[in-house]
Amino acid sequence: MATTNPGYLRCKEERNNKSFFMVLQSVDVSSENLVESCRYMTMGLAVKRALPYDFVRSFTDKELSLGISKNPTFYYMEKSGWEKFVRDNTLGTLDGKEMMQPPQPRAFLASSSRIRRFRTEQGEDDKKEEVVSESSNRGRTTAAESVGRKLKLGKKAAEESQESKRTEKVVRARRDEAGASSSTAVEFTAVFQPAYLYNLRIRSSVKDQMPVEKTIFKVHHPNGKKFWNVVYLGSYGAFSGGWQCLVKEYPLVVGDIYLQVYIHQTGGATSSCLQTLMMMDVRVRRNY
């Protein structure tokens, strides 16, 4: 069946080449079942890469380190392999051609390494020139502008100081509130239901005795050989993050199971997101 897709015809012609170069900017070849091609988007273009069959045969399994997805007509490089190839060869946005060849002698690799090092050093020199240019421009400000800038900085520092004091008061209040709500042990019993496979929502009467903020609980297994960090969300009154892992590894199953949960605080609030570290023991009693 004849085709009128010019992009596909180009692909068929490229297949017979010993080297490899394809940049399809606005060509739609999906209608020809070329759906396994990789797209490389960092150049702002939809770049598709195809390897001719004869070219791929020139590699051995040990030489070709890129992943290859086989297609009845073409061999396409996987995205991770292509991106590594681009990084190793320092191909930038101005590089319009990329050529692939079988492994080259060490002399060629050494020259490529020198080229990459030259490009890196050149980029660092350009950055240094920009910094020097900006600093020289800043040095031309007038005395009036300097005075105005100092006044603005002083006003901003005063505002930040007041804001930090207000934040410190709020933090202290929250810590006191969390400590008061969890200073005594909390105990409750619940029948394990299917909903508990995903999170454990506690009763309202128990929720009033729990921390009001996000809290991390360290849950120990009765045998003492394993523990889990489970996140308690005070606003929802439920154990969420890490709970599914606990259910799977404990293990807990739906059935005639009763949870006897004992909760007690072991320390103050940590500096990370005001998360209080607490201890929780989960004991299972099965009737079979």
Curated annotation (Swiss-Prot):
Residues 120-176 are annotated as: Disordered. It comes from the Eukaryota. InterPro entries: DNA-bd_pseudobarrel_sf. It is found in: Nucleus. Its main location: nucleus. Residues 133-144 have a biased composition (Polar residues). One of its GO terms (cellular component) is nucleus. Keywords: DNA-binding, Nucleus, Repeat, Transcription, Transcription regulation. Residues 120-131, 156-176 have a biased composition (Basic and acidic residues). Residues 22-116, 185-280 bind DNA. GO terms for molecular function: DNA binding. This is Putative B3 domain-containing protein At5g46915.
